[in-house]
Amino acid sequence: MRHANVTLTRFLAGDADHLMTTRPPTALQAVLHEVAASVKTIASALARGTLGDSAHADSVAGGAVLAYATRRRKLAETAARNRGADDAGKPEYQLAFDPLNCPWNADINGTAGSIFSVMRVQSQGSDADGAADTCAQAYGELDCEPYDEPYGAPFLQPGREQAAAGYTIYGPATMLIVTLGEGTHGFTLDGQTDEFMLTHPSIRIPAETGEIAVDASNERFWEPPVRRYVHECRDGRAGCRERDFSLRWSDALVAEVHRILMRGGLFLMPRDYRTRSAMRGRLSAVYDASPLGFLVEQAGGMATTGRERVLDAAPRTFHERMPLILGSASEVTRIGRYHREHDLGIDAPFTSPLFRERSLFLPETSL
């Protein structure tokens, strides 16, 4: 079957068996359908922008979160109806959903996105006091309020255990990028049919890249291996890399990762020494690093903290932060090697001399 005719519903039902050999369980399909419905509502709210009764971006972001909360209640009610008496209080899956990542971009009509992660609930992981309480805890966004141990337990395990992950990017077109462990696939929202259509099957990230996304304003707080890597990229053809790189920063996590999935690149949000909390990293392990790392790896890329594979890290708390470096495999491998060399004390000390050796013949001007 040609992928141009495949909707998200048909994809999850197994109609694209050339892309996914295993049909996802019915309960997981239900979660992903509700995620799709939620992001459609969020996309509609964002498209109105400031045409409502407020001229502030905060109201747009608040409306998007409220739209998700409405879907969340419906999803919990559906889970309760489908749950037998013996299974009461035992949801099969739990969803971590960041409904509006980087909401400040709405103020400038910039790109925003949603990120989600789905974990299977272990049989021994649910011991809630009652079915009603558990039903309310079955699904929810971890960034809005604290959750108790019965809810969060499924997320306190390595990211490689995710059942599904994805993000939505709200741009000129609304796209849903999703993985269920068999490749990373992109769906575009058709404005006429209101259906997500499979437009980017089996996304692959090029192994080599010349584009780096990093906030260079934090350079003075970086660890030496990160500074070493970025400076080598800046030196371009005149340096040891012997080729030019393009550095950029948009302060939009989903947009940066989407660009990498579409055309390759490297994203760096390393730990730094600006604050005590930043030394542990700046991105959420549960609903930023883990789902995005899953998507990138399934597309042939790599994701690391600098010292550890992201999907091997098990967060200890719901709100744990971690550094994130992801993208084209060759560059992630290189920066991982720089971290190992630094930790072993075998890397060349990083220097930034005031005066460099110069020549009348510069490599970057040669033909």
UniProtKB/Swiss-Prot annotation:
Pathway recorded for this protein: Carbohydrate biosynthesis; gluconeogenesis
Major site of localization recorded for this protein: cytoplasm
One Gene Ontology term of the molecular function aspect: fructose 1,6-bisphosphate 1-phosphatase activity
Broad EC category: hydrolase
Subcellular location(s) per record: Cytoplasm
Highest taxon in the source lineage: Bacteria
Enzyme Commission identifier(s): 3.1.3.11
GO cellular component, one term: cytosol
InterPro entries in UniProt: FBPase_C_dom, FBPase_class-1, FBPase_N, FBPtase
Keyword annotations: Carbohydrate metabolism, Cytoplasm, Hydrolase, Plasmid
Keyword Disulfide bond attributed: no
Protein name: Fructose-1,6-bisphosphatase class 1 3
UniProt organism field: Paraburkholderia phymatum (strain DSM 17167 / CIP 108236 / LMG 21445 / STM815)
